[in-house]
Amino acid sequence: MVKAICVVKGAVVNGTIIFSQENEGSPVYVNGTISGLSGGLHGFHIHEFGDTSNGCLSAGAHFNPFHVEHGGPNSAIRHVGDLGNITSCPSSKVANVLIQDNVISLFGDLSIIGRTLVVHENQDDLGLGGNLSKTTGNAGARVACGILAKI
């Protein structure tokens, strides 16, 4: 079993997310809470660099080692880092995160440990929209981020 923690911080958005994976090839479970979000859907992605020296901007693009188009978490073609959306309750401004993903890994050369988790301002269109959809999902500004650390 490998586990990682990510403490995400932004101007008003913050939270803690735990990643766990039983063994290489098994699903990764992602759970935690993000608070301070506006109500609705928000893009939730692993970005390529473990760098927050210039805020969330220095995290680079979505983690995409196979150089394919952006998609949703259940798409046949997607970036490794494409985790889709999290949903924030309009009244509490809290998103309870519970994701099971079969593409990301905490093992090997493609491990997401040491990379940056980014929470976006807007809904990820899962690669189904126009313009930047095939690279960013049109998810908008980066409102919080943090680097995954092994625990």
From Swiss-Prot:
GO terms under cellular component: cytoplasm
Location, primary (coarse class): cytoplasm
EC number: 1.15.1.1
Residue sites binding Zn(2+) per the record: H62, H70, H79, D82
Pfam families: Sod_Cu
Disulfide bonds: C56-C145
Keywords, sorted A to Z: Antioxidant, Copper, Cytoplasm, Disulfide bond, Metal-binding, Oxidoreductase, Zinc
Top-level enzyme category: oxidoreductase
Entry binding sites for Cu cation: H45, H47, H62, H120
Catalytic activities: 2 superoxide + 2 H(+) = H2O2 + O2
Localisation per UniProt entry: Cytoplasm
Cofactor(s) needed by this chain: Cu cation; Zn(2+)
Textual note on the cofactor: Binds 1 copper ion per subunit. Binds 1 zinc ion per subunit.
Domain of life according to the entry: Eukaryota
GO MF terms held by the record: copper ion binding; superoxide dismutase activity
GO biological process, one term: response to UV
Family label: Belongs to the Cu-Zn superoxide dismutase family.
Oligomer status and interactors: Homodimer.
PANTHER family: SUPEROXIDE DISMUTASE CU-ZN -RELATED
Function (record text): Destroys radicals which are normally produced within the cells and which are toxic to biological systems. Protects spores from cellular damage caused by UV LIGHT.
Name this protein carries in UniProt: Superoxide dismutase [Cu-Zn] 4
Gene behind this protein: sodD
